[in-house]
Amino acid sequence: MAPTPLFLLLLLTGVTAEPAHPGYAEGDGSSCDVAAVAVAERREEFDGGRIVDISHYYREEMPEWESADGTGGGFLRLVRSMRNGSDIANFSELRLTAHSGTHVDAPGHVFDHYYHAGFDVDTLDLAILNGPALLVDVPRDSNITANVMESLHIPKGVRRVLFRTLNTDRKLMWKKEFDTSYVGFMKDGAQWLIDNTDIRLVGVDYLSVGAFDECIPAHLVFLEKREVILVEALHLEHVTPGIYTLHCLPLRLRGSEGSPARCILIK
């Protein structure tokens, strides 16, 4: 006997569908449900806290290197708009430096011969950018020197380390004006890491891995042999120290020495 229409209706109403986009309230299922009111929910954690987004979202007040004005209001523009009737879809235009917000550095950033030889972000090793990572707290009263590195007792075999510093406590990535007093690696700290550890990915919580006074010397040490990948301006505020699985994916920008990146940790 074929089920009655009423029975089919009861079966269908008893099924609870998972939202396709968990960050927004669901409409009636229509792709053009303009009458529904959607409320955007922005989160740092997903899947019950198992996945943590450690990238900073791009905004006008985000700091930029040696700028008092931050990213500015012109970095993201809606150039074609449905609302004013000029188009059937919205189209935005993005204008940023390659080292804005959470980003990676390629060897060509500080070595001109590497830049012209093609060592751009498209050549970075995804096997280094993805895998187990250790998050450590750095002593809050110092830049990252050789003595500080030695005091952290990072075990041999650890290949990816995220360094949380006073920058996170001071919320420097939430302040529009660039701050030269940020914490970073001194040249001797970078050299100690290269000489005494197996680290191949270095992550930090402000715009540069190198302290302001030794910014370029620290970069040169890290990138000279093209074995270390630098990830800068990470959002580490709500993450506890420990071991995670890191996934960090820059854009495939052929010819660029840097790229914005989306980085997540999985517990």
UniProtKB/Swiss-Prot annotation:
GO biological-process terms attached to the record: L-tryptophan catabolic process to kynurenine; response to cold; response to salt stress; response to water deprivation
Subcellular location: Secreted, Extracellular space, Extracellular matrix
Main location (coarse class): secreted
Record-linked Gene3D superfamilies: Putative cyclase
Domain of life per record: Eukaryota
Signal peptide from the UniProt entry: 1-17
A cellular component annotation (GO) from this entry: cell periphery
Keywords, ordered alphabetically: Extracellular matrix, Secreted, Signal, Stress response
Tissue occurrence: Highly expressed in leaf sheaths and leaf collars.
A GO molecular-function annotation: arylformamidase activity
Family membership noted in the UniProt record: Belongs to the Cyclase 1 superfamily.
Function comment: May be involved in the control of plant responses to environmental stresses.
Protein name, UniProt field: Cyclase-like protein 4
Source species of the chain: Oryza sativa subsp. japonica
Gene, per the UniProt record: CYL4
